[in-house]
Amino acid sequence: MHTILINKLMSLKQRFYKLEKSLNNFNTINNKEFYSLSKEHTYLHEIIKYFEEWLNIQKNIVHTKDMLSDIDMHDIVQDELKILNTSKHNLENKIKILLFSDPQDQYNCFIELRAGTGGKEAAIFAGELFRMYSRYIEMQRWNMEIIHATYGECGGYKEIIIKVPVHGSYGQLKFESGGHRVQRIPNTESQGRIHTSTCTIAVIPNIPNAILPEINSNDLRIDTFRSSGAGGQHVNTTDSAIRITHIPSGLSVECQDERSQHKNKSKALSVLKSRLYAINIKQKQQEESNVRRNLIGTGDRSDRIRTYNFQQGRVTDHRIAFTSYKLHDIMNGKLDILIQPIMCKHQATLLDQLTREK
């Protein structure tokens, strides 16, 4: 582990025990301060627990290495060192994940997929990305629900919004936000020409209602209409589908998944609130640091983050110049092939920033 990071953790350890002392003397602090200190203490608790385990293992490694000179014990000591080093490495990964996590990483999320340029082919591509995420979610043993879907004329989706109600799913999937581009020969192409189509993804944290700001009802316009299925046919005889527009920002959300107008309204409002919250958070982050903007992207749908080239069987993530030739596996849900490298790069970038600040 980098010396700068160890020094940072030593500093956090001192802070953690100082917090414990203050919280034990709760009569000397008011309720608001107690809540704030408790929140910080909870955040540091797991980090310090793993760090203290790491320090103990580090001591054991030094002590065990001293025994290598004993010829009779050499093989046993080597095996013990392998076990200790594996444990040490695992703890370092856990510490980095906790230390460099975003406060919103703990939340579940919405994934919005929208077909971009490319017409019918873009909608088909959006459908394939939806299948990719569905398979990934299934592999993680998570669950999901469709909030809203507008079907493409030849299959796929013009737009689809899904909810992944699993703790920490936002932190796992947030790097998917941005523009996804596909290069391939469509089935409808008779001359064998490669076409380029795009789909935009937005991964939004589903913030608990207790944290979300209230929206003035006068700022909302609510429209009702009949739900429609693939091909545009109406699948409901009542106006159960809902469209909510936030007038000041111009943001709008549709929901037609439920037969109940009340349930559709509740779901649409939840998505709208999360979108507005995400925009506010993004603005603050852009003011504070370039790290997120450079690596995760601005969240702007025009950011091209990834290209899927079917002719060459490759996927390239442009943010970290990473290319994999396992396109088939990725499209079948093995998304960790792409997620893990960018998460590692993100941690390395934050550590580098920490070093420069030091």
Swiss-Prot record:
Gene Ontology MF terms in the entry: translation release factor activity, codon specific
Metal-binding keyword on record: no
A Pfam cross-reference name: RF-1
Disulfide cross-links: none
Keyword Disulfide bond (UniProt): no
Keywords attached to this entry: Cytoplasm, Methylation, Protein biosynthesis
Modified residues (N5-methylglutamine): Q233
InterPro entries the record matches: PCRF (IPR005139), Pep_chain_release_fac_I (IPR000352), Pep_chain_release_fac_I_sf (IPR045853), Prokaryotic/Mito_RF (IPR050057), RF-1 (IPR004373)
Coiled coil stretches, renumbered: none
Coarse class of the protein's main subcellular location: cytoplasm
Top-level lineage group: Bacteria
Post-translational modification note: Methylated by PrmC. Methylation increases the termination efficiency of RF1.
Location(s) in or outside the cell: Cytoplasm
Segments crossing the lipid bilayer: none
GO cellular component, as recorded: cytoplasm
Record NCBIfam families: prfA, PRK00591.1
PANTHER family on file: LD18447P (PTHR43804:SF7)
Function: Peptide chain release factor 1 directs the termination of translation in response to the peptide chain termination codons UAG and UAA.
Official protein name in the record: Peptide chain release factor 1
Lineage, opening ranks: Bacteria, Pseudomonadati, Pseudomonadota, Gammaproteobacteria, Enterobacterales
